[in-house]
A protein has these predicted regions:
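NAD(P)-dependent Rossmann-like dehydrogenase/reductase catalytic/cofactor-binding core
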Residues: 2-3, 43, 188-271
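Internal alpha-helical scaffold of NAD(P)-dependent oxidoreductase catalytic cores
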Residues: 24, 98-107, 114-210, 235-242, ...
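Structural motif
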Residues: 30, 46-50, 86-88, 129, 131-134
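NAD(P)+-binding Rossmann beta1-loop-alpha1 motif at the extreme N-terminus of oxidoreductases
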Residues: 1-46
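Rossmann-like NAD(P)(H) cofactor-binding subdomain of soluble oxidoreductases
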Residues: 46, 54-117
Length: 271
């Protein structure tokens, strides 16, 4: 059994705990009764960062992770402990932390969870992605995951590529939702049944059947898609790239979404 620490006990933190429940696990969350941060880090070989990354001023807000890493790295510097970032962070973040704390070992490994089925998804992954530049870190993290998921497709890569995978997946699915809503509107105008059209489309193996549903609320909401598409738009602007498509998707969502639930969900949007 491995000694694991979880920092942040929300959906992602609980998913990590559920995944590795046969190991020795401690968790810290400042908002609930939990083990003190110092004890979690000192007693853990692998420390999973499962903290919120809300958006603020049209870009990602990493302040919660920043605040925690300042304390965590005091205990991980010059040790064999590995910090595994599970939080969704914009590409380049893990490298930034590696340079800021060069005596600590970092890895990025994204989660791909549906909010309503996060425990089920956590133990039935399509693939596992391990992003680390240090080959020894890769080897140790892969060994941890291989013991739990011996038959799951596993990718080894650098942390920035791993971070990009998460944003590509989430923002593509958000775009797919908006496209489905637009075709739904067309079908209504033409007085035809969208669900019948959809049924004939999704048998095409290239399409994938998920995220074609259109809800009464329209568009997308929740904890992930809104903050992630805003964060990626912000990164594009920081890199002087053109985010026209992403901006169009987000603006369309703001226009059609009846319930902007992300405004009220804690840690999705910072004040």
């Amino acid at each position: 059994m491995a000694n694991l620490g979880i920092i942040g006990y929300g959906i992602v933190g609980k998913a990590v705990e559920h995944t590795f429940k046969d190991n020795n696990i401690l968790y810290y969350d400042k908002f609930i009764k939990s083990t003190p941060l110092k004890e979690v880090v000192e007693k853990s070989e692998f420390i999973f960062i499962c903290l919120p990354t809300p958006f603020k001023n049209d870009k990602i807000d990493l302040s919660i992770i920043d605040e925690n890493l300042k304390e965590i790295t005091k205990l991980t510097d010059n040790t064999n402990k590995i910090i595994i970032i599970k939080s969704t962070v914009v590409p380049g973040t893990t490298i930034k932390y590696s340079r800021l704390y060069p005596k600590t070992k970092f890895c990025f490994s994204p989660e791909f969870l549906r909010e309503a089925h996060y425990l089920e998804d956590a133990v039935n992954p399509d693939r596992i992605i391990i992003g680390a530049d240090d080959l020894d870190v890769r080897k140790r993290v892969i060994s941890l995951f291989k013991k739990r998921f011996p038959n799951v497709l596993m990718f080894e890569t650098d942390p920035t590529s791993a971070e990009t995978v998460k944003y590509m997946a989430n923002c593509f699915l958000a775009t797919k939702v908006i496209f489905a809503n637009e075709i739904h509107d067309l079908c209504q105008k033409l007085k035809i049944d969208y669900n019948k059209v959809k049924e004939m489309v999704i048998v095409d193996k290239r399409m994938g059947s998920s995220h074609f549903g259109v809800t009464n609320e329209k568009g997308f909401g929740g904890k992930c898609f809104p903050k992630d598409i805003v964060a990626l738009i912000g990164l594009y602007k920081d890199l002087n790239l053109d985010p026209t498509l992403l901006e169009t998707v987000w603006k369309k969502n703001l226009k059609i979404r009846k319930v902007k639930d992300w405004e009220d969900i804690p840690f999705v949007k910072s004040d």
